[in-house]
């Protein structure tokens, strides 16, 4: 069950971003930290680099939007960033852009046990994620993949 505050924050952030030619890649809300933390990752449409100025401008806009919405009635920390190394691959474009890059895949096997594999991203088709592990291609059914994350070349 989704938190209604998170849902509302995602809508506010997405609408605010769209008005500036940006899109929200990810939004995390941590109500248990003091102060509350809201982390928003943005990128330009189509995927272009986001500058520090873009993050600062978006931070100002979304902060004002959150204040006006009265969703959060206590102090909060707002963190705006852009995707970078170590981030999750999610879109088809991500998988095309980072072909050949080192990744770590978290997936479940037939017994529903979570496993990881590390290698180079080879391809993502409609049915499989293919990774190159020491020169051998390993196929993981897409429905079993939980996350795919960029890693450093050393692992």
From Swiss-Prot:
Subcellular location: Cytoplasm
Entries under Pfam families matching the protein: RimP_N
TM region positions: none
GO cellular component labels: cytosol
InterPro entries according to UniProt: Ribosome_maturation_RimP (IPR003728), RimP_C_sf (IPR036847), RimP_N (IPR028989), RimP_N_sf (IPR035956)
Gene Ontology terms describing biological process: ribosomal small subunit assembly; translation
Residue runs in coiled coils: none
Keyword Cell membrane appears in the UniProt entry: no
Key words of the record: Cytoplasm, Ribosome biogenesis
Role summary: Required for maturation of 30S ribosomal subunits.
Record-stated family: Belongs to the RimP family.
UniProt xrefs under HAMAP family: RimP
UniProt protein name: Ribosome maturation factor RimP
Native species: Prochlorococcus marinus (strain MIT 9211)
């Amino acid at each position: 069950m989704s938190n209604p505050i998170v849902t509302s924050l995602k809508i506010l952030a997405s609408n605010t971003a769209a008005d500036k030619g940006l899109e929200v890649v990810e939004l995390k809300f941590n109500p248990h930290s003091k102060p509350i933390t809201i982390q928003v990752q943005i990128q330009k449409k189509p995927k272009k680099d986001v500058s520090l100025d873009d993050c600062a401008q978006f931070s100002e806009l979304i902060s004002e939007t959150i204040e006006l919405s009265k969703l959060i009635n206590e102090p909060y920390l707002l963190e705006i960033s852009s995707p970078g190394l170590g981030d999750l691959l999610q879109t088809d474009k991500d998988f095309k852009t980072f072909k050949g890059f080192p990744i770590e895949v978290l997936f479940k096997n037939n017994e529903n046990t979570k496993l990881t594999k590390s290698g180079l991203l080879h391809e993502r088709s409609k049915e499989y994620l293919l990774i190159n592990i020491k020169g051998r291609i390993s196929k993981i059914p897409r429905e079993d993949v939980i996350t795919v994350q960029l890693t450093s070349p050393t692992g």
